[in-house]
């Protein structure tokens, strides 16, 4: 079942779509900035690092909390208030910052910054393509989803195998996958923006937050894959 509402009777103009997409990108940017700040702050605060990484229970508890927030936002957005949806997205972004704070310990600041710039360029190019192309990308959805499941399973298996070859295979395949997902998701969000009633501020905010989460996940995962390739370890 499609989690987005269908409003075929509502004719949305170009202004409504542009407003929706602007809010999607705006909230995604806010989420990324919050994640970056929390990650940097945690990495420079020993007490926070001890709290996050001294216990596997704490670390994996944070991971589970992140997954729960994604499922709640994705599956229950219509039942949430606009304020609650925004709060949950901000909470998710902050928790992601905590779990990713170790990259500031593992990699040099300059390589993190350069990887972020490259990620931004790749993401921007593919998102622009997804928004402007006349080609229907919906046919790639099944393949991209299967690829996503594949790299998740391979990553879990590699926790035990500890295979460097498998790790690099997952990394390079992951780059291709999230580049594709960026274009696919952007086109999907564009279609959603043409269907929802953007004149309703609550509806606009809730689906902008959900769209922001979608593109945020694409960006973060693409960044992490590229950081493995481009990052200079300390």
Locate predicted features:
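A hydrophobic alpha-helical transmembrane-helix feature that marks the membrane cores
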Residues: 1-234
